[in-house]
């Protein structure tokens, strides 16, 4: 049997996304789902086939803390800050396309003896993780080192940073946090455990609270919150949040 070219097997996706051309800048952070997919194409060719066995878990400093439960948020004060149905559909398509790429890549790496339990990029120290996430893009060469358990714990850390009491979070300016949240959700294995849904719901409530603080004309600042809320409802089926989108 004749094997398909390697590049062709990686085209299984929900959207038609072009591979990076000569104008592609890998140092420029992605600003949309489509650009994130292009970065995935680029990163795919740089992922190692085999990595070493990890020596420790991330859980050490994260498993002993719990998320602060937020009250049920109020409905948005300005309807103009809500996403349109067309916008929501486009974001879901881009997200599902990214997930499809991750699934294909994981299968290919498994066929090449890729060890997903490889050493994580940092220690179990949450502050070092935060520093790393602030200064590095969420590349596949990093995220594919993490097991499902590690991804869940990373999502929990991100959700805590989203409601940091010592800073004023604005996902339009704190782009690093928005990108890591999106990329971690892309890489999560399904189905999810109940405690992961609890983390997702915490993130959704926080996004609603932050969006409710915006003024009527701050539509652009609402976009990152709308994206995470849309994914929570339309991808992860937390339908009781649908009134907020």
Curated annotation (Swiss-Prot):
It is found in: Cytoplasm; Cytoplasm, U-body. GO terms for biological process: adult locomotory behavior; flight behavior; protein-RNA complex assembly; spliceosomal complex assembly; spliceosomal snRNP assembly. Expressed in nurse cells and oocytes. Pfam families: SIP1. GO terms for cellular component: cytoplasmic U snRNP body; nucleus; SmD-containing SMN-Sm protein complex; SMN complex; SMN-Gemin2 complex; spliceosomal complex. Keywords: Cytoplasm, mRNA processing, mRNA splicing, Spliceosome. InterPro entries: GEMIN2 (IPR017364), Gemin2/Brr1 (IPR035426). Signal peptide: none annotated. Disruption phenotype: RNAi-mediated knockdown is late larval to adult lethal; the phenotype is the same if knockdown is restricted to muscle tissue. Conditional RNAi-mediated knockdown in adult muscle tissue results in age-dependent decline of motor functions, including climbing ability and flight. Component of the survival motor neuron (SMN) complex that catalyzes the assembly of small nuclear ribonucleoproteins (snRNPs), the building blocks of the spliceosome, and thereby plays an important role in the splicing of cellular pre-mRNAs. Most spliceosomal snRNPs contain a common set of Sm proteins SNRPB, SNRPD1, SNRPD2, SNRPD3, SNRPE, SNRPF and SNRPG that assemble in a heptameric protein ring on the Sm site of the small nuclear RNA to form the core snRNP (Sm core). Belongs to the gemin-2 family. Component of the core survival motor neuron (SMN) complex composed of Smn, Gem2, Gem3, rig/Gem5 and one of 3 almost identical Gem4 paralogs encoded by Glos/Gem4a, Gem4b or Gem4c. Part of a minimal SMN complex composed of Smn and Gem2 only; this complex is active in UsnRNP assembly. The SMN complex associates with the entire set of spliceosomal snRNP Sm proteins, SmB, SmD1, SmD2, SmD3, SmE, SmF and SmG, and with the snRNP-specific proteins snRNP-U1-70K, U2A, snf/U1A and U5-116KD. This is Gem-associated protein 2. The gene is Gem2.
């Amino acid at each position: 049997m004749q094997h398909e070219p390697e590049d062709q097997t990686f085209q299984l996706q929900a959207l038609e996304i072009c591979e990076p051309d000569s104008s592609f800048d890998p140092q420029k952070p992605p600003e949309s789902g489509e650009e994130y997919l292009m970065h995935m194409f680029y990163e795919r060719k740089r992922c190692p086939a085999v990595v070493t066995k990890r020596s420790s878990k991330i859980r050490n400093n994260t498993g002993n803390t719990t998320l602060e439960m937020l009250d049920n948020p109020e409905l948005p004060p300005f309807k103009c800050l809500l996403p349109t149905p067309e916008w929501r559909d486009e974001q879901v398509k881009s997200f599902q396309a990214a997930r499809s790429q991750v699934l294909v890549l994981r299968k290919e790496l498994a066929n090449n003896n890729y060890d997903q339990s490889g050493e994580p990029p940092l220690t179990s120290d949450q502050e070092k993780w935060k520093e790393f996430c602030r200064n590095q893009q969420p590349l596949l060469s990093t995220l594919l080192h993490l097991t499902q358990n590690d991804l869940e714990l990373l999502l929990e850390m991100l959700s805590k940073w989203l409601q940091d009491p010592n800073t004023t979070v604005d996902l339009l300016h704190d782009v690093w946090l928005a990108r890591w949240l999106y990329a971690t959700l892309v890489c999560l294995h399904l189905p999810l455990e109940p405690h992961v849904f609890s983390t997702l719901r915490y993130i959704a409530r926080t996004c609603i609270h932050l969006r409710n603080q915006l003024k009527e004309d701050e539509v652009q600042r609402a976009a990152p919150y709308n994206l995470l809320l849309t994914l929570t409802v339309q991808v992860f089926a937390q339908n009781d949040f649908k009134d907020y989108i």
